[in-house]
């Protein structure tokens, strides 16, 4: 499958890229590939109690869909609702492909395009595109950074990483 543009990541940045591409280049084909089973990136992944933005939503949110809620520092569920509203309002659903993880991307100079290997539920698919736009996060979903704390081995409680929050806590 060939697209003019492949956007990687269906979080805030990928959704913004999709909106702007659709508005400014309506004749260009594009897909937003999301490696996980849901859109939202950080806001879908982290589920611990009290998760909220560390920046005000007037800054973090979209220029084309201003944040209109009373609380400018928003909780995670409110941000997810905002992202879903945006996708629906601007008809980006058909452009988003969930469970599509980029395994490799190679530039082919002879053909002047990107050749991608996409893992879709452990099945590799080939895709090509002219423009490859990376809008993914900066961390691993499966192997987060775990800092070492002095005397950590003597701590008698549970050490919990927020990325793997246990709902029973």
Residue ranges of model-derived segments:
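Active-site acidic short loop of glycosyltransferases
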Residues: 2-3, 27, 128-130, 157
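N-terminal Rossmann-like FAD-binding beta1-loop-alpha1 element of flavoenzymes
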Residues: 3-32
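Short amphipathic alpha-helical segments
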Residues: 19-20, 44-45, 144-148
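Carboxylate/His-rich catalytic cores and anion/metal-binding grooves
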Residues: 32-41, 128, 133-136
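Glycine-rich dinucleotide-binding loop and its adjacent helix/turn
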Residues: 61-62, 66-70, 75, 79, ...
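Feature captures the FAD/FMN-dependent oxidoreductase FAD-binding
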Residues: 70-141
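Glycine-rich active-site loop/strand segments that organize a redox cofactor
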Residues: 37-85
